[in-house]
Curated annotation (Swiss-Prot):
It holds the Pfam family YpzI. Residues 1-26 have a biased composition (Basic and acidic residues). It comes from Bacillus subtilis (strain 168). Residues 1-45 are annotated as: Disordered. InterPro entries: YpzI-like. This is Uncharacterized protein YpzI.
Amino acid sequence: MIMGKDRQEKKLKASGRVESDRDQSIHYDGATSLEQNGRFKKRKS
């Protein structure tokens, strides 16, 4: 587990997005569930 996480962190650090990657997955989760309700698209436009 530690090795796997270390590997991932090295990858993220290399692309310069360690913390933002976690935020993005959270946003993606919310975006998809909101889009299914059709509210996200309405709010965006």
